[in-house]
Swiss-Prot record:
Residue(s) carrying N-acetylalanine: A2
Keywords, comma-separated and alphabetical: Acetylation, Disease variant, GTPase activation, Metal-binding, Neurogenesis, Phosphoprotein, SH2 domain, Zinc, Zinc-finger
Entry GO MF terms: ephrin receptor binding; GTPase activator activity; zinc ion binding
Natural source organism: Homo sapiens
Any Pfam family matching the protein: C1_1
Subunit field text: Interacts with EPHA4; effector of EPHA4 in axon guidance linking EPHA4 activation to RAC1 regulation.
Protein name (record): N-chimaerin
Rho-GAP domain: residues covered: 268-459
Amino acid sequence: MALTLFDTDEYRPPVWKSYLYQLQQEAPHPRRITCTCEVENRPKYYGREFHGMISREAADQLLIVAEGSYLIRESQRQPGTYTLALRFGSQTRNFRLYYDGKHFVGEKRFESIHDLVTDGLITLYIETKAAEYIAKMTINPIYEHVGYTTLNREPAYKKHMPVLKETHDERDSTGQDGVSEKRLTSLVRRATLKENEQIPKYEKIHNFKVHTFRGPHWCEYCANFMWGLIAQGVKCADCGLNVHKQCSKMVPNDCKPDLKHVKKVYSCDLTTLVKAHTTKRPMVVDMCIREIESRGLNSEGLYRVSGFSDLIEDVKMAFDRDGEKADISVNMYEDINIITGALKLYFRDLPIPLITYDAYPKFIESAKIMDPDEQLETLHEALKLLPPAHCETLRYLMAHLKRVTLHEKENLMNAENLGIVFGPTLMRSPELDAMAALNDIRYQRLVVELLIKNEDILF
């Protein structure tokens, strides 16, 4: 049975925007120009990149070799002051350099000159290439979509319950009508929800502080990458919201202080998550797959059929709030499609997709090859480009999907159908062009289909 396109799995633009991340990857790398002779009176906090009292013209000649080249010189006009000379954009840039225990040319302080130059090259490159893009970052925020407030809301099955005043008659009622009144269905609960129950009861200004993020991080207001090595943005000290400095001015006053101890699972970089929890794979992947395999392998349309979106959001909230203690058992979520939906949502919300932007072209290339042996060889080479945590998670997922296909007679899901569902979920084109991304969907589907069919060979 072949499926063409599912209503619930049509192409959707990714939540997290990769353009600035791609630019950071492309930025020139630092290249230290060392002095070949001993320089008298060299400050102890500089290394062989210090060339003494040389002119701007002499520095320019030394740096002409490559983009990213740098050296430090002492000013001829103002002895005792120092200049960082840096090659960028085919010209030499000169910055007054300071040291107070750390190196700096502006607000940011660095432990080493190398880190200062690396961060500077990233900033110069991104601001040169994407000045207009950066100026418009705050125009279409995703803040309401990510919804930090959803982490603290009541679950769907609770928040729709009306506030009922208990009466003496209600407590003593044993008749069928009394039981029915107290056990309102979820549909009736939704119908009785009052509009004012959805309005926040108070406002609180976020307590933003400049923050250095370890590992890749994305702004939770505009969904763009937070570039640089240190002080890439600001973090709310009370609720943990991470945003660009310029985006912090646009965030509404909706800080929830009781979220400060929450460690997010969804929308967190995969490698960062597994390192933080010291696990081989993200807990949400392991727990969802175990639950699906324990009671859902024979479910018709597994992964194709959508679950109720409010309850999928509840599962996401449970993982973000409770981590590995999240209850996703049949007692909480009888419909297995809620769990499959939560797993697909986890992969869709990854800032860097499971099949990363760097590896994406190689995977697409493999799907276009007609010779089966060459195709598998290229696919094997593509897998080597994945970070270890991504590769291990992909291996585990493909082994699971292979087991799903063994129950095809019952669930009607073969490798081709699963490829249709998971292709755009696990892979996202690094290209900004929507048409190019749409054209790649058929190859994305084929990549996943090949990974499932050849799981035992490739992994």
